[in-house]
Amino acid sequence: MTPLRIGTRGSALATTQTTHVAETLTERSGLAHELVVIRTEGDVTTGSLASLGGTGVFASALRAAVLDGVVDAAVHSLKDLPAAQPETLEIAAVPARADLRDALCARDGLTLATLPEGARVGTGSPRRVAQLKALRPDLELVDIRGNVQTRLARVPGLEQHDDHAPAAAGSPRGDLDAVILA
């Protein structure tokens, strides 16, 4: 039997999430699967997400791969999907929700409350920028791009940012629990 070809972005987090979905499908249906890595505009462009047009920069190549028959299905973070989808595509399943909180990964055990005034916080999310500005208007918020591992690698050396605010859901899937502050 031909394996189900499942499209995924190539980041460690994306392949971990896709592997989880693919293995669950195999367990429940007996279908074999094959992961197919698709490079997206968001993966290869270094500009801010806002300058790239925001939603869809990570999903458009995956959507095209499904429509063109390169893959049979694709797994992607729902938050990055545009609200309007082609009529020929369907969101066929949504896995159980992971941790919905955002996480602060900071040096020396600092928390959002104990960050020094004017601390530099890196995030690529306009939503997180708004939340951080509301809670700590004194912080310097810096646009940051890259996968979770790349962004976290910037924290210990403090070359650019005092800390980083990613989604907590990405952490257990990427084995990053040790750097998340509760």
Regions found by a protein language model. Give the residues of each.
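Domain-level signature for soluble enzymes in the chorismate/prephenate branch of the shikimate pathway
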Residues: M1-A182
